[in-house]
Amino acid sequence: MKEIGIETEYITLGQLLKMTDTISSGGMAKWFLSEHEVSVNGEAEDRRGRKLRPEDTVNIPGTGEFRIVVAEGMSFDAH
């Protein structure tokens, strides 16, 4: 499982798809999520605006499994 460090309270699922090079533009997120079974914390998710916070895990078919973490040097209350 790969870790994705974030410097904000959360990122959206659409942002994660771009960060992992799963899609080349944000406009592709809705299409990708309608065609592929992405899961967040083990549950199917098709909303590109889904907020991902530290400790969330995301499985993207063909790309891999990711865990959201607080970026090194950052500190904030994750929940």
Positions of predicted regions on the chain:
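Low-complexity, intrinsically disordered short peptide segments enriched in small/polar/basic residues
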Residues: 1-3, 35, 57
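A basic, amphipathic helix-loop patch mediating RNA/tRNA/ribosome contacts
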Residues: 12-54
